[in-house]
Amino acid sequence: MTTFLQAILFLLASGTVGQSYLTAAAAQSGASSHLDAMKSLYRREPPLPVTNQPLVDLGRDLFFDPLISASGTTACVSCHLPQLGWAVTDPKSRNDSGKLTSRRSQPLTGIGHAGKAPLGWDGRNPTLEAQAKASIATGSMSMSATPTPVKVEIIEERVRANAAYVAKFKAALPDAPINIDTIVLAIAVFERTLEPAVAPFDRWIEGDQAAISESAKRGFELYNGKALCFTCHRGWRFTDDLFHDIGTTSTDRGRGAVVKDDPSMQFAFKTPTLRDVALRPPYMHHGQQATLDEVMRHYEKGGIDRPSRSPLMQPIVLTNEERQDLIAFMETLSGGSGAAVPKR
């Protein structure tokens, strides 16, 4: 259990979670008020530095190219659209064969800032390179119960036979061969540049008081107080990059299928970013909730009571106005179709 989680559980027990957390934040940031303290916790980090622009450009081309799938019809972008925060609105993704997988795709926006956190709903991939390789090698986006192995040599030969790619690999990695490892390296390097577009919330954080509505401002205070949303969806990316069982109806064991000796990880899934969240319903790993209103009501009830359910899942009572204020706030996290796509 992380130190942060231990602290939050203590504050939950004392009934002072929102106030105590923000008092500590104010002391650390030097903020003059609780509101300023809250805002300081969500200020964007600068984009990650690019040290090899030709490699980023190569990765972008590969990300958008169905050439690297077995069928020749599916690309990374098929499940990660830039205008939707690098995700899709399908309740469940389809694999390269067109069959439904067991989960929906996770957004990639801001993924480069996840550091060393395990990736995917169940955290089975330690790096973006590993995730891309698994997607290509199984043709399943790593979400199918019955993946079909793909001969990566076929993909490698296709890329080597493409004169444009040969030239781009030479420019980006002059001394490296063209193989599955350098292909996924380029894709991963590109994915680390996928910064969220500037949203109304960001403009408000930086001082534009008119950027968001009064309802959204009230929602922000609820988010960091009574509603307890910040306990998992915190920081400027609105995720703790951890795994929690939030009590959804599902037979999918999530992280528990990967870390089988940890009872607390049964039915636990990665906390997704809330950046661009209003653009990509439905919600949860299976698309169980159709709207943000349904999501709010799930958290109000506290989810299914079972041994693995996160202790952070505490029933709460929200008025209709408070629920709408929270939704208004989350709608300010969308940057729209201006999602930052690196130039080719």
Predicted regions span which residues?
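Hydrophobic h-region of N-terminal signal peptides that target proteins for export
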Residues: 11-18
